Curated annotation (Swiss-Prot):
PANTHER family reported for this sequence: 39S RIBOSOMAL PROTEIN L28, MITOCHONDRIAL, LARGE RIBOSOMAL SUBUNIT PROTEIN BL28M
Residues spanning the signal sequence: none
Name listed for the protein in its UniProt record: Large ribosomal subunit protein bL28
Any GO MF annotation of the entry: structural constituent of ribosome
Length: 77
């Protein structure tokens, strides 16, 4: 399974790990993904999403119905 937020599309980034001696090696920055269940009143059921913290804030701001409509318009849910 990909480490990608289902709402925002955020995924891993590549950067440098920098030591005290300023040696640089490649590393991955992973998004803060969490599994969350949301009650969808219009469908009378639970929806389980793997979302980042930014996606959770987006759902708090706009509501789960708006976010689900956007996901379905993109063909992801």
């Amino acid at each position: 399974m990909a480490r990608v937020c289902e709402v925002t599309g955020k995924g891993p980034m590549v950067g440098n790990k920098v030591s005290h001696a300023n040696n640089r090696t490649k590393r991955r920055f992973l998004p803060n993904l969490q599994y969350r269940r949301f009650w969808v009143e219009t469908e009378n059921r639970w929806i389980r999403l793997r979302i980042s913290n930014a996606g959770l804030r987006l759902i708090d701001k706009n509501g789960i119905d708006v976010v689900l409509a956007d996901l379905r318009a993109r063909g992801q849910a």
